[in-house]
């Protein structure tokens, strides 16, 4: 599993906006990593097997997490491969 540093404000934002607390995020990571894609501004998008997207920065600091649909996953993966365009 990746070593992700969780900040209190980022976890609070993730929970308030998307309903993901630290235990849900860790459970999503436990389900397995489906794909890792480079996003904009040196952010890394981690897609898990249960279609949760976890975004971290270049220093492995947690930024946010949210649920992704299969369609969003395909579109974002293609955008990630094209440098976010």
Language model features with spans:
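Ribonuclease/tRNase effector modules and their secretory precursors
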Residues: 1-85
């Amino acid at each position: 599993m990746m070593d992700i540093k969780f900040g209190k404000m980022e976890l609070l934002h993730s929970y308030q906006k998307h309903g993901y607390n630290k235990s849900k995020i860790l459970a999503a990571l436990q389900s397995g990593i489906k794909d890792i894609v480079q996003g904009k501004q040196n952010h890394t998008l981690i897609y898990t097997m249960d279609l949760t997207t976890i975004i971290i920065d270049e220093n492995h600091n947690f930024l946010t997490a949210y649920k992704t649909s299969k369609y969003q996953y395909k579109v974002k993966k293609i955008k990630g491969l094209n440098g976010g365009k």
